[in-house]
Amino acid sequence: MELNKIYHMDAFEGLKNIPAASVDMVLTDPPYGTTENKWDMPIDLEALWKELKRITKSNAPILMFSQMPFTAVAVMSNPKMFRYEWIAEKGNATGFLNANRMPLKAHENILVFYKKLPTYNPQMEKGSRTLEAKVEAREIMAIFAL
């Protein structure tokens, strides 16, 4: 397959054309199977993992967008390689048709899988909400420490 070229084809057929251990990172947003739309049919995760394991280098991260309940299915499809998740805040919430029955969905999960630890360059901001939350968590834990 030619580098930096977009191919319109079945994903599994395309994956077969990628050489083994040649991919530095995978970023995928597979169908979640949470709607009745034709394009949202679940894919064979076992077959996907077989190809992703074959084409990725040993330290290549595999980042997979997901949303519950697909998140649970995706994690359990490869618990050995699952490491952690990131939360991506959406600019616009979805799920307005069900707004009378449940909260709108304002985030997606990004699941992080890998075989060996990839290069990670932390991005930190002083005073970010995440940092503040960690401080609060430490303070709460200190209250319960006997």
Which residues are covered by each model-predicted region?
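Core catalytic lobe of class I
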Residues: 2-146
